[in-house]
Amino acid sequence: MTRDSIETAYSFLHQKRYVYIHSRLEWQRDDIEYAIAAYADTMSPELFGHLADGKKDFLHDHNHFEEDISKAVCLLEKMLNI
């Protein structure tokens, strides 16, 4: 996993998380969940594995999405020493 892949993931997830947690529009939140799940499917497998920590439906489960994206952003911040 490269620093560039970590920075890219952080930029995308941080921005989408901010909009997601402040949005009250269900269609917008659904669109963000879809975009993040699609991004996760193309993410570096090593990076995704580190973030998911064995959770198979990480960033793909509607019921745990806010928790998952918050965890991912937190871990990425630690990896980048932010």
Question: Language-model segments: which ranges?
Answer:
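Short terminal alpha-helical segments
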Residues: M1-W27
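Residue-level marker of intrinsically disordered, low-complexity segments enriched
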Residues: D4, R17-V19, D30, Y34, ...
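Charged, amphipathic alpha-helical oligomerization/scaffolding segments
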Residues: T8, F12, D31, A35-A38, ...
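Amphipathic alpha-helical binding modules
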Residues: T8, G54-I82
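A structural signal for well-ordered alpha-helices, especially hydrophobic packing surfaces
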Residues: R17, I21, A40-S44, H62, ...
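Acidic, low-complexity, intrinsically disordered interaction modules
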Residues: L25-E66
